[in-house]
Amino acid sequence: MSIRDGCSARFIFVTGGVVSSLGKGLAAASIGALLQARGFRVRLRKLDPYLNVDPGTMSPAQHGEVFVTDDGGETDLDLGNYERFTGVNTTKEDNITAGRIYQQLLAKERRGDYLGHTVQVIPHVTDLIISFILSNDDGADFIICEIGGTVGDIESQPFLESIRQVSYRLSKNFTIFVHLTLVPCVGSAGELKTKPTQHSVKELSSLGIQPDIILYRSAEPLPQYQSAKIANFCNVSADNVIPALDVESMYKLPVMYHAHKLDTQILSHFGMGAPEPDLTKWANVLTMVNNARNVVTIAIIGKYTKFLDAYTSLTEALDHAGMHSGIKIQVKWVDSRLPVRESDLHDVDGVLIPGGFGDDGVDGKVLAIGYARANGIPMLGICMGMQLAAIEFALNVAKLEDANSTEFNQACKNPIVVELPWLQKGEGEYLLGGSMRLGSCTYRLSADSRVASVYGSTVINERCRHRYCINPQYKNVLEEHGLSFTGMSDSHGLVEVLELQSHPWFIGVQFHPEFKSSPFAPHPLFTSFVQNVLQIKQRGFMHKSVSAAAILVPGSSVVS
């Protein structure tokens, strides 16, 4: 673990108490950004206590989005925040779950690696967790480890025991514990209660971990006497009781935490000095957020509209593009599982169809695509959104009867979308998890295409996550009717990009551009989309004369 100046990496462990979803991931990302702004090299990791091997097969309604890394990892959404805040690419080795730990453990036991010993949680499970924490520091000065779940959860105990052991082995000079809790506001008088924080710290201390810094989540800072109360009863320095206040934009968090000296206290704990952080780029982002003057409404048509964590990277990518273009993005969420009505779409300036799986809500997405295509509304389709754009075009323009995807109907007459050739089911067990095309891929764009103009290049790299693709047998017939396939994969010859050149702005991509957008470098595809949404709105190019009722969806009869 040697790094600059011959020192060892310092470890920052971020835990959470009272309730989940308090913002541990954003706190960890903010700490990373602040230390980075002081000239240090950081690496961030997430340890999840659930028994799934990875989040790839988990419902977004329960877990939120699956963030895909360059090397093909299906990881927790917090890794997306780590990348957006620090600009440091994460890998599949930066996210571990209890399921993956037990998978490794049982494989070792079957091989006989434990030489007849009784395999137990301690030391065998904890040793594997510790090995993950200490591995692959890549020359980082600080490794920030977020522990998923809440103190008190049974499944979290092996992870908490592991970080306790790391602290014991490396000494306090190389580890620090940051604990995030909730200070709820109770009653009509708005009284802030510190007792849940005290109980959470008591629970953590009973496991052998004494937090060094307490971040309390609250709508407003505590009065000095209540902050002192937390310090006294939680055995923490008063300077280390730091507010984690509600903010309008997550990109205000590093500035806010620095104002409350979080990074200063961390460095003080380690006895380290450093220059003041250069937060200019963060100040610039906040200025852009506050200075957006133009407003556009973009409809996102999806089936997880009540669980917005399912679309975290997507909405952030829209915001990045908007803030750099002086445009405020208003998202109109449309649940595709419900009947999508014309009234859901008539007042929007752009339509975005995100990725997804399964036939639930497909008809609503196809109807929205057709309405956007027919009425000149800018449309961006991602992953399944691109596949459905091809199906909608086949049904309503090429007039191909029963055009569909074999994902939804294996017996359809015109399978526009089919399973990837190398994934098609053969004999033996079919594994759903970890069996998709994943990670960074190289794509070649047609030189005269709109998308090549957007990227400023004919060769791009993007991250993908899919099991189905456009059927190459239908490429010619769809092109004959006006649909252009302007991007192909470099290695497999798959259709990766489509566009409708007769339309003001209509692009579908098989990959996930949202995973590579940041507040400091918005993704060019989202920037082009958002800017064209505004321009087309201002110029009045959208006519909206074609009724949604005229759009055929999969399973409809084709009218010649």
Swiss-Prot record:
Entry keyword set: ATP-binding, Glutamine amidotransferase, Ligase, Magnesium, Metal-binding, Nucleotide-binding, Pyrimidine biosynthesis
Q: Does the keyword Isomerase apply?
A: no
Look up the EC number in the record and give it.
Answer: 6.3.4.2
Q: Name one GO cellular component term.
A: cytosol
- Residues recorded as binding UTP, renumbered to this chain, are 20, 193-198, 229
Q: Where along this sequence does the record place binding of Mg(2+)?
A: 78, 146
GO annotation (BP), single: pyrimidine nucleobase biosynthetic process
Q: Which GO terms describe its molecular function?
A: ATP binding; CTP synthase activity; glutaminase activity; identical protein binding; metal ion binding
Binding positions (ATP): 21-26, 78
Its biological purpose: Catalyzes the ATP-dependent amination of UTP to CTP with either L-glutamine or ammonia as the source of nitrogen. Regulates intracellular CTP levels through interactions with the four ribonucleotide triphosphates.
In the UniProt entry for this protein, what further remark is given in the free-text comments? CTPSs have evolved a hybrid strategy for distinguishing between UTP and CTP. The overlapping regions of the product feedback inhibitory and substrate sites recognize a common feature in both compounds, the triphosphate moiety. To differentiate isosteric substrate and product pyrimidine rings, an additional pocket far from the expected kinase/ligase catalytic site, specifically recognizes the cytosine and ribose portions of the product inhibitor.
Q: What PANTHER family does its record include?
A: CTP SYNTHASE (PTHR11550), CTP SYNTHASE-RELATED (PTHR11550:SF0)
Q: What is this protein called?
A: CTP synthase
